[in-house]
């Protein structure tokens, strides 16, 4: 179990991957408004599709892939839950999305980074570049209620942050006596992971007779 934390080593390990300066790889959250996003996409005709991705209660992701022209034409509808739907057969929402009430709507999330996934085996004839799909993390709505894992996590974090602020407001925290708790504006939760490379390392050496 080899954990690589050194950036220089990591770059050598994944040195086979080279970024193409002609391709767009992500759209940072909050950096572009509607017109900025549409202008950026217009400059990259190799991005042919958009994929809205939602996570159900079992942790499975479900996505709907749509031509980029529809996304650009009906941009606002994608953030209002009016553009893309799926049925309950593709998601796990026990006793929520039922057979006779299965419609689930996607709502694109504008508060997170969007990424572009390229298919190197499918080259765009007009540009000579691989065909790209803009992947947008999304929420899932059923009967006007957010029901997906991401929305539950978001509400949980918002609730815990508010309760923590109430709990420590005006109080002295041991080890942080000089910290002005009353001035805390927000509590932000982050998650982290580590990139691991698994290698086979025999624990014993054997002598084999031929």
Regions found by a protein language model. Name each.
Residues 2-210:
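ATP/Mg2+-dependent ligation/transfer catalytic cores
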